[in-house]
Amino acid sequence: MSERGLLIVFSGPSGVGKGTVRQEIFSTPDHQFEYSVSMTTRPQRLGEIDGVDYFFRTREEFEELIKQGQMLEYAEYVGNYYGTPLTYVNETLDKGIDVFLEIEVQGALQVKQKVPDGVFIFLTPPDLAELKDRLVGRGTDSQEVIAQRIERAKEEIALMREYDYAVVNDEVKLAAERVKHIIETEHFRVERVIGRYHKMINEELPLPLR
């Protein structure tokens, strides 16, 4: 039976560039994990593909899945639900495959309660002025929504202490390399690998004949 995979939880404020950094990580052939597509009730943006960028569902459909206990985590953010389907994550981890979750901060804290041995990585902007420029540059939100996102970002940055690692997204390629290095290092933590060596610890070897 293969070892259970590693759950990698990646989050940060809206507009910090989570999706861009994640795409950079997955653009290289050396990554050894699968991306877990999140589910949301927010409107589908131009160029987004259902089942690739997100699973887009109505509010009624999402709430029914919550009632059925089919979400690993979920959160309501600026009037929309975001969450992670439970079945896919468990099936993938049980196969020994690492799962990469890109989720909101509220959801990440829920996951930490259920899967405390996951790897929790917080992506932060260099400063709030840069974050505001990125939100304005997207051209998808009103000034009122941008102001809400900035205030929410302050609250989320204060929760950074709940994470294992913080990565500054000052340059996409560099941030992606930092995240990959963290994941690689986590695979060598003693508490993750000790199970492989139980047989070695208990094994008795015959002494050489003289």
From Swiss-Prot:
Signal peptide: none
Catalytic activity field: GMP + ATP = GDP + ADP
Record: residues binding ATP: G12, P13, S14, G15, V16, G17, K18, G19
Gene3D superfamilies the record matches: Guanylate Kinase phosphate binding domain (3.30.63.10), P-loop containing nucleotide triphosphate hydrolases (3.40.50.300)
InterPro entries referenced in this protein's UniProt entry, alphabetically: GK/Ca_channel_bsu, Guanylate_kin-like_dom, Guanylate_kinase, Guanylate_kinase_CS, P-loop_NTPase
Cellular compartment(s): Cytoplasm
Keywords, comma-separated and alphabetical: ATP-binding, Cytoplasm, Kinase, Nucleotide-binding, Transferase
EC number of the protein: 2.7.4.8
GO cellular component: cytosol
Domain of life where this protein originates: Bacteria
Record's function text: Essential for recycling GMP and indirectly, cGMP.
Name of the protein in its database record: Guanylate kinase
Protein source organism: Streptococcus mutans serotype c (strain ATCC 700610 / UA159)
Source species taxonomy: Bacteria, Bacillati, Bacillota, Bacilli, Lactobacillales
